UniProtKB/Swiss-Prot annotation:
It is a single-pass type I membrane protein. Its main location: membrane. Glycans are attached at residue 54. Integrins are a large family of cell surface glycoproteins that mediate cell to cell and cell to matrix adhesion. This is Integrin beta-2. GO terms for cellular component: cell surface; focal adhesion; integrin complex. GO terms for biological process: cell adhesion mediated by integrin; cell-matrix adhesion; integrin-mediated signaling pathway; leukocyte cell-cell adhesion; neutrophil chemotaxis. Keywords: Cell adhesion, Disulfide bond, Glycoprotein, Integrin, Membrane, Receptor, Transmembrane. Belongs to the integrin beta chain family. Disulfide bonds join 36-43. GO terms for molecular function: amyloid-beta binding; integrin binding; protein kinase binding. It is found in: Membrane. Dimer of an alpha and beta subunit.
Length: 77
């Protein structure tokens, strides 16, 4: 859709979970490895920010990278 407006559209992707300190995440070593509330769920450890994809005009690559991302957890209620 954006390519219909401009020929120079680019998109990048970065991801953040939360601050990696109390009171935002549980700092117990086991919970840092897998912060999901249910033990049978597998979540990635919390992180402040990850650069995932440089600016690109490739919409398929953007979709693929977003689709590969796992969930994490925090202490929000």
């Amino acid at each position: 859709a954006l390519n219909g407006i401009t020929k120079s559209a680019q998109i990048g992707f970065g991801s953040f979970v939360d601050k990696t300190v109390l009171p935002f995440v549980n700092t117990h070593p086991e919970k840092l490895k897998n912060p999901c509330p249910e033990k049978n769920e597998n979540c990635q450890p919390p992180f402040s920010f990850k650069h995932i994809l440089n600016l690109t005009a490739n919409g398929k690559e953007f979709q693929d990278q977003v689709g590969k991302q796992g969930i994490s957890g925090n202490l929000d209620r």
